Swiss-Prot record:
Entry superkingdom: Bacteria
Pfam families: GCV_H (PF01597)
Gene3D superfamilies (alphabetical): 2.40.50.100
PROSITE patterns associated with the record: BIOTINYL_LIPOYL
Protein's organism: Vesicomyosocius okutanii subsp. Calyptogena okutanii (strain HA)
UniProt-listed GO biological process terms: glycine decarboxylation via glycine cleavage system
PTM-bearing positions, type N6-lipoyllysine: K65
Known cofactor(s): (R)-lipoate
Protein name: Glycine cleavage system H protein
InterPro entries registered for this protein in UniProt: Biotin_lipoyl, GCV_H, GCV_H/Fam206, GCV_H_sub, Single_hybrid_motif
Amino acid sequence: MSEIRDDRQYTQTHEWILDNGDDTYTMGITDHAQALLGDMVFVELPNVDDEVSIDDEFCVVESVKAASGVYSPADLQIIEANEALDDEPELVNSSCYDDGWLVKFKSHSVVDLMDSTAYAQILN
């Protein structure tokens, strides 16, 4: 069974978003997503200051099985990308909710996300 953390919100496309409390957010892919993809071999991250529109693909995670796009949950601006993933993409597998986060972003329009209970229901 996939780990789902109560302190995050989730998208239909299996990304998690953590509200940092200051109009900034941290984002990654869920435990369910990383398990389906398998061992990560590469993560293509956006650049700091990139502006991304809602539902646009802005990041790619590549595993031994497949490459998968990561989609924006809102209109946002990237403020940090997890550079540790350049050398250790496997952090997405071993620590998807902690060390394996993908980006931090600013946004005033993060809406329509699921809480942990709703996300668990779509996995069942």
